[in-house]
């Protein structure tokens, strides 16, 4: 450090104007900074003008004094040291070059070095004063611009035409949002801010470039007006210490180095932000709350932080993670992803092995019909993970992860599940129009109502109640489903000709038994009844129409397609450990194919014999095949080996038809749709293969606690404790859903993925895996209507129960509407409604048959929906709503 020399009175008189002017400039800047910290914008403008004039005078006086000074030394004085700090050692002097210049001019090298050093000190201090003034001026301009933008946005938000636009936070927008117009700000006037913001940025870069030695110096820790940064060593210091003016030096670790503490060192500080939006949740907890207007809706005392889409976002109530942010970015997030997948398996096990069987006992105790039970209890059993995910999203994580999960799960169930059923079904399944029409009608109504309620990004309690009322209406409709279906079909088929072609005309030769026109149903009496199609012509009153009846959902009879599905629901645990394989149900014997063709197809009426006197009505008969004995083969989904008696024909038929049926008594193997009488209880036995043993070990940490705490209602002893299983299953589902959402949020934050996107893709697919497996198994058994109805029916439960119940509880408890923050979610729901229309149109185009072409079409629609929804979420496509 260079030592000051003794000054003469003449030299001090020459330096006095510069010293006094610099002191005035420093005092003006300090007063300006304090007014800026107090947010006194009225006095800030006047102080800015005064400080600017003082800075200009100081710069002029300093330059004049330096030019008049011709002595060999530039003296130090106490006044000069109080007016400006000595510069850091970063402003080094090239003594060799200056020594050469000094020798040419006749000056001593040491005197010349001190002269240049002190000139640089004064000039740099004036430059710093000017820099602060420029930055404060830019801050004032930015604050005024943001205030006007917020005022325009709030005014526009009150208008009906632009009610969807929400105002930005009163504490200001983040620097990232201001400097990057691609940021998802809800402000409608963001485009008009681009030019002044870029101009401000250019000026800031220019003023930062004036300090040549500042770029190499380490930046001090960021400080915020009105609050402290947890990364700073002095968290409790007052902001006046940080803004202590020109005369308060901040010493560094170097012995002879000093550093000027600039009040604004980054873009966020330049614009006067009180909160850093890139901080962790722990850092946000130390921030000072904003205005009373912003905190009016925050009734739980949770600190607000700025969000891209809404005015306030509450801190999630999740515990602190075991890993730091750096560790998560370096690979620890993989453990969270594995944990989320593990929770998918846990939810599937508790729903399939404990929750659904307990619901089956409740249905049996209450005597509820299959239609109502399928729409209520069984739908709740399959959609329990989505319901609890929505509850956690509203009350714990305070985001739209529940909405994203339910919307994504709905699309997954409609498109992906139906596509998988069409691809992996053994035969081409025929669908009945009534169940699809019924479920899609209620689902369309619920989606349209939900889109209308999302128009202002808020859900009130009465809106949630209306959504739940739609579900009550759906359950009431299912109570009289058979009567309504019969009435509607009578109205449609009244005085109309309905022709069902002969089944053997619909199939190529040699593949008759593989037709989906023929359905088999096991009768209680131990017989297999094969149903044939019919041809009906309108005739005069009193004509006998012996229409075919049965349990199958086809033709003109009632469908009766909605069943509880509990008997068909094979758990994920059984698929992983036990012997069930959904893709290998056993082979059908070729002889059974031939006999099945004879028994069910050749009896059909290929042509009706006209009679004199008008139109005739002819109907197909039932071919009743009595079973002598029935033995199950030793296979997982075994075939039925049986011996047939002579067939008997029921109904009045002409003798010329009886001659067409030639069935010989022979032993054959026939495959019929399986209906399990009693579900098997959970088996904890040690598996016999290495793969199953490995799976058993992996799921044992989940399975053993549930097996110890939840009675198995599929056993006679555990059936008495079904309330314990029911309540305990709900507790386990809530715990697993909490862990799933927590770890998914951590993984999404680490990968910079919004919660809505995580719910729309990853969580939606994971929570729908059990329904996918069940639907594929049901479709391979030949129940296409049940597979489609269960997919659409679970979506009705999700939208009308999974979403409104948490919203209704929130409105009752806190008396405030639920804020819906996602911009693209409204458009995603709209596209979901369009996809539902496309599904119905696709099924109609494929003539109500589930074939592989329909499956590939469903896959194409699913990936198109996901792609468009992601573009809405990331503002690649602007959502017009």
From Swiss-Prot:
Annotated transmembrane regions: 195-215, 331-351, 376-396, 403-423, 434-454, 459-479, 721-741, 757-777, 796-816, 823-843, 853-873
Topological domain ranges for the Cytoplasmic compartment: 216-330, 397-402, 455-458, 742-756, 817-822, 874-881
Residue positions with a glycan: 69, 514, 551
Primary location: membrane
Superkingdom in the source lineage: Eukaryota
MF terms in GO: calcium channel activity; calcium, potassium:sodium antiporter activity; symporter activity
Residue windows of the Alpha- repeats: 372-412, 764-795
UniProt GO cellular component terms: membrane; plasma membrane
Residues on Extracellular side: 1-194, 352-375, 424-433, 480-720, 778-795, 844-852
S-S bridge residues: none
Comp. bias regions, Low complexity: 149-175, 228-240, 542-551
Region of interest (Disordered), ranges: 79-111, 149-181, 215-255, 272-315, 508-565
Biased composition (Polar residues): 85-95, 296-315, 512-537
Tissue-level expression: Expressed in the adult nervous system. Expressed in the photoreceptor cells as well as in the lamina, medulla, and optic lobes of the brain.
Swiss-Prot/TrEMBL keywords: Antiport, Calcium, Calcium transport, Glycoprotein, Ion transport, Membrane, Potassium, Potassium transport, Repeat, Sodium, Sodium transport, Symport, Transmembrane, Transmembrane helix, Transport
Compartments where located: Membrane
BP term (GO), one: calcium ion transmembrane transport
Membrane topology (UniProt): Multi-pass membrane protein
PANTHER family linked: SODIUM/POTASSIUM/CALCIUM EXCHANGER (PTHR10846), SODIUM_POTASSIUM_CALCIUM EXCHANGER NCKX30C (PTHR10846:SF72)
Family to which the UniProt record says this protein belongs: Belongs to the Ca(2+):cation antiporter (CaCA) (TC 2.A.19) family. SLC24A subfamily.
Record function comment: May function in the removal and maintenance of calcium homeostasis during signaling in the adult and in signaling events during embryogenesis and patterning of imaginal disks. Transports one Ca(2+) and 1 K(+) in exchange for 4 Na(+).
Protein name according to UniProt: Sodium/potassium/calcium exchanger Nckx30C
Native species: Drosophila melanogaster (Fruit fly)
Gene: Nckx30C
